[in-house]
Amino acid sequence: MYRKKKLLALLLALAMLLCACGGQPAQEPETPETPEEAPYAFTLEYHRCAPLVEQQIGSDLVAAARQVIDAFLAGETAVMLPEGDYGGNPGNDLGYALNSMCPAFGAVTDYDDNRFDKATRTVTWAYTRTPEQVQEVLTALERTTVDCMSLLRQGDGETARALLLYRALTEQAAYDYDVSGTYDDDPAAYRFHTSSYSALVLHSGICYSFAQALAFLYTQAELDCAAVMGDSETAGLHMWLMAAINGKWYYLDPTWDVGGGWYYFGMTAEDRATWAGEFTGAALLGQDAAQLADLSDTRFSAVNCHWWTDMTIDRQAGQAVFTAAEDEKTVLPLN
């Protein structure tokens, strides 16, 4: 009996010791991810509008765009806007903003300039797809956007974000040379296949599609930007992007870089007027782009006008490394 009591006491003491120690070996505390490794904090928000776009169309029209988007997401077909400044061509300006804020809207509705009634402050549209198809489009757009943003990291600055999202859009893309002839008798199909949604999700479109698609991605990643139009004798009417990267403004042409590359990334206005298509001017909703921003910075001159085959973001070294055939490479500081 004495031995049993002694054994029981020893077991009880051992149990108390294990409880005090947690009963498990000590574990190393988890090391938090560094900004270079942690995912980019992102939430899809269709209300986001680039500052330059808001500067051009005004805060009242941006508020109108947000009201239209909310109604669209709710399956409605009209909104009545509050009193505000809707001068000029508000129908066109509203459509322009919507394409870079909510690409699905232009893809699955028949909205055009005439759907904005200034007299009644009413915006109307009809759906060109069934409710189920509209939901499929929204789901695909969200999935694609999240996939693009997953390439970014918490510590990525504006240069890294701009480069990575540019590649995400262009790498798998192809220009749709058949769109005009294929959908001449089907306006709904034409709108769908030339929308910024098509460029993002289907990796196909025309210049308008890719410029506004890049504007959407950059706006979601909080990069200021706006799509601009230009015309030249050699290239014809064309749309591309102007964007601010680390406080400087540049031209970017994702359409001419479809298939991957940075040949037309980070151009100056002089580049655009010479080797990059001879576009001697560009306009943002009728406003001369050269009057809106200084487009003379040559930071990306070592990158553009060259066929690079790959680009790697070295976050530890703070640089982007561009490589080409025969081990040719150039290094671009990210800051």
What are the residue ranges of the model-derived segments?
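Alpha-helix capping and helix-loop boundary segments enriched in small/acidic/polar residues
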Residues: 56, 67-68, 202-205, 229-232
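N-terminal accessory/pre-domain segments preceding catalytic cores
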Residues: 22-157, 163, 276-335
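A short, highly charged nucleic-acid-interacting micro-segment common to nuclease
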Residues: 196-210
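Hydrophobic/aromatic-rich core segments of domains that either
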Residues: 209-276
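C-terminal motif of bacterial Sec signal peptides marking the signal peptidase cleavage site
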Residues: 17-20
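Bacterial N-terminal signal peptides that target proteins for export
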Residues: 1-11
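Secondary-structure boundary elements
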Residues: 133-199
